[in-house]
Amino acid sequence: MKMRVEAEREICQARIIRVVAKDLVLPNGRKTTFTIVEHPGAVAIVPVHENGDVVLLKQFRPSIGQEIYEIPAGTIEKGEAPLATAKREIIEETGFKAKSWTKIAEFYTAPGFCTELMHVYVARGLTPAK
């Protein structure tokens, strides 16, 4: 017997995410409820200058209550391809555009409770976006 969803109910619909509770029947017949964050997916970009320097952003993150350095990233809009998101986000967040793009990874950020699939790109040939 496989795990099966017996019922699902929405807990919260926010701007980007949706939180649902799923009532599951486990392979051993036991019932449990999982809370899942549904996320449309995101991209992360490693922008590399010709000299090898990587562009980092310093941003305040309310979830952890502090500023941190991070690579540019953003949420995939409905109907948007991951690479198109990356090209949009690098301009919005850094003011650069890139001549070459290489996808280096794709992974679920927190598969125990979230559906977010992260697409990671290296961007080279950086020039000002104007």
Model-derived features: where do they sit?
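Acidic, metal-coordinating catalytic segment for phosphate/diphosphate chemistry
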Residues: I11-A44, E50-N51
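Conserved active-site beta-strand-loop modules that form the wall/rim of enzyme catalytic pockets
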Residues: D53-V54, W101, M118-H119
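Conserved Nudix-box catalytic region and its N-terminal flanking loop in Nudix hydrolases
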Residues: K2, F34-R88, A105, L126-K130
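Beta-rich strand-turn-strand
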Residues: E80-A84, E93-S100
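Active-site-adjacent beta-strand/loop module that shapes the phosphate/pyrophosphate-binding cleft
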Residues: V20, L24-N28, A110-K130
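Extended interaction-bearing regions that mediate binding to partners or small molecules
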Residues: M1-C12
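A short coil-to-beta-strand element that immediately follows conserved catalytic motifs
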Residues: R4, K97-I104
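Acidic pyrophosphate-coordinating catalytic loop
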Residues: E10-A14, P62, F107-M118
